[in-house]
Amino acid sequence: MIRKANINDAKDIVKVNVMGWKNTYKNVFPQTFLDELDPEDENSIRKCQEKINQYAVCEIDNKIVAMIRYGRNKKSYDDSYAEIYALYVDDSYKKQGIGSKLVEFAFEELRKEYDYVLISTLVDNSANEFYKKIGGKFVGNCDFLLGNDKFVENMYEYLLK
């Protein structure tokens, strides 16, 4: 079931997010950085609770198996643009349409206030094919900084209205 997240979901959202990072970015980001990511980190859980209105989740058998975070675009001053900040699906539940359903849920929410959505993902991320498949138009690259390391992301644009 896809639904808006509530404050009680924060711990599970952080867990899905951290496991998503560890699985997706293995051999991409420094392993020491990934090893430090803690799914039980109280600070991360608190931050998630503070922004819980930006999250939706997929719950199956009372377990959060996927999450999406969305809101105003942080990369642009154009108020007509929203952004998908994060989308992670537990590896055991991938290739079942959950990611597509979460994106569509977020688009419906964002359509109320915005005309466009941007999604950025690392150029080497296998998710690039997914974002193209669901209608993303490649609009350029942007830099992503992680500590002192710079990575390049592809940006995809979606028309909401």
Map each language-model feature to its residues.
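Glycine-rich phosphate-binding loop
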Residues: 93-96
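Short proline/glycine-enriched turn/loop segments at secondary-structure junctions
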Residues: 143-149
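Conserved GNAT acetyl-CoA-binding A-motif
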Residues: 110-122
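Terminal substrate-recognition subdomain of acyl/acetyltransferases
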Residues: 150-161
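Conserved active-site alpha-helix within GNAT-family acetyltransferase domains
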Residues: 100, 124-140
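Acetyl-CoA-dependent GNAT
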Residues: 4-10, 15-28, 32-91, 103-105, ...
